[in-house]
């Protein structure tokens, strides 16, 4: 609660921190252990930043007590949050957008962001989220993709209006009344919309859809299905 009220979030790990910094986020405070950090790519850049006055050197023992998880590459930083909205998205012609409704588990959202990053999706829009976009578990599971893929949160109604105004077709992933995803033309601007693994999409999305698609995979693995659709 304090972190959110102050507009701050925590990043652990050299890779995640560099993704964050390169995406324009400001370091508020940083704690680092050179003994651990120097073994990782990007250590020189992080140490140079630390010497500018935002870094505090700590021993391996102290760092071990501070770190949220093991193997975090010797650095943990408190960052200043940036809350992007739909108006901040700069989409190319015929974009691929991933839309997630009411996602609850930070680890799942992080994995979806990782898949979206690997597939070069142009944006991820999280509608009516039940988790914080700067949750430490989300940042960790995304391996920093939450900073490299434009990611915004909004209501489902706002997102639908945004997509319709830009002529981006809405494809909802669902089992009922749907066609196989590979029979659908995704060469134009496309938003792939998925709900939670437990309950799927709400009616507001089913009714707004231009087409309903399904993915012939056993189980309800949301992150796997997003990855498959993005690569298609």
Q: Which residues make up each language-model segment?
A:
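N-terminal positively charged helical leader segments and presequences
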Residues: 1-70
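Glycine- and other small-residue-rich loops at beta-strand/loop junctions that grip anionic moieties
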Residues: 9, 101-102, 127-128, 152, ...
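RNA substrate-binding interface of SAM-dependent RNA methyltransferases
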Residues: 22, 47-48, 59-61, 83-84, ...
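Amphipathic alpha-helical repeat scaffolds
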Residues: 13, 104-111, 225-232
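Short, acidic/turn-prone active-site loops that include or flank metal/cofactor-
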Residues: 35-37, 61-62, 129-131, 197-199, ...
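Structured adenosyl-cofactor binding patch, chiefly the S-adenosyl-L-methionine
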Residues: 77, 118-119, 133, 138-145, ...
């Amino acid at each position: 609660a304090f972190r959110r009220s102050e507009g701050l979030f925590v990043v652990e790990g050299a890779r995640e921190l560099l993704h964050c910094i390169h995406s324009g986020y400001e370091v508020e405070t940083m704690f680092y252990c050179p003994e651990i950090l120097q073994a990782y790519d990007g250590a020189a850049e992080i140490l140079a930043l630390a010497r500018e006055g935002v870094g505090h050197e700590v021993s391996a023992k102290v760092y071990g007590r501070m770190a949220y998880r093991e193997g975090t590459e010797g650095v943990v930083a408190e960052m200043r949050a940036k809350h992007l909205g739909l108006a901040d998205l700069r989409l190319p012609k015929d974009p691929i957008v991933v839309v997630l409704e009411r996602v609850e588990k930070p680890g799942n959202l992080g994995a979806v962001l990782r898949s979206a990053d690997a597939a070069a999706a142009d944006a991820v829009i999280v509608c009516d989220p039940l988790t914080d976009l700067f949750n430490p578990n989300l940042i960790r599971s995304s391996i920093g993709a939450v900073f490299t893929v434009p990611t915004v949160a909004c209501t489902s109604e706002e997102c639908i209006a945004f997509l319709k105004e830009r002529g981006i077709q809405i494809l909802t992933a669902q089992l009922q009344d749907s066609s196989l995803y590979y029979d659908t033309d995704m060469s134009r601007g496309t938003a792939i919309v998925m709900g939670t693994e437990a309950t799927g999409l709400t009616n507001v999305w089913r009714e707004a859809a231009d087409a309903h698609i399904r993915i012939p995979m056993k189980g309800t693995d949301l992150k796997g299905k997003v990855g498959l659709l993005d690569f298609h």
